[in-house]
Amino acid sequence: MIDKKELREISLKKKREKRLTWEEIGKYLGRDKVYAAMLLYGYAQATEEEADKIITLLDLPKELKPAFLDAPMRTPAQPWPPTDPFIYRLYEGVLLYGPVIKDVAHELFGDGIMSMIDVKIYVDKVIENNYPRMVLTFNGKWLYYSKW
């Protein structure tokens, strides 16, 4: 059986060949475009139905299904420091604005953290003053620190 890394390479190649967008794949799966990307990148575990749909949509061999059903190994895929400019800017945003976001969040919610397990991530495009802008939303469950 192939691993998630090989599965990602095969899946992304097929996506490019078929000229599919993440939006199209997400709609086909009944999921958000970011979650669809997570499935093809191997960052999320597909359900039986999702695996079947991906295999059909991308014309993949049925033998790849078990790899989609495997639980992913969630280790950082990026070097530190990040070398990709886009990903570096995401890190930069957290490094620069993290203390401020944390302070505002604690004022709103109290002492805790936002779950990155129970989270939904959305990427959207808006036009503001005739310029495209990216809207990045992390919608995560708030987890309070325990008291004992």
Swiss-Prot record:
Q: Which InterPro entries match?
A: Cyanase, Cyanate_lyase_C, Cyanate_lyase_C_sf, Lambda_DNA-bd_dom_sf
Q: State the source organism's domain of life.
A: Archaea
GO annotation (BP), single = cyanate metabolic process
Q: Which Pfam families match?
A: Cyanate_lyase
Question: Family assignment?
Answer: Belongs to the cyanase family.
Its function, per the record, reads:
Catalyzes the reaction of cyanate with bicarbonate to produce ammonia and carbon dioxide.
Q: What is this protein called?
A: Cyanate hydratase
- Gene name of the encoded protein: cynS
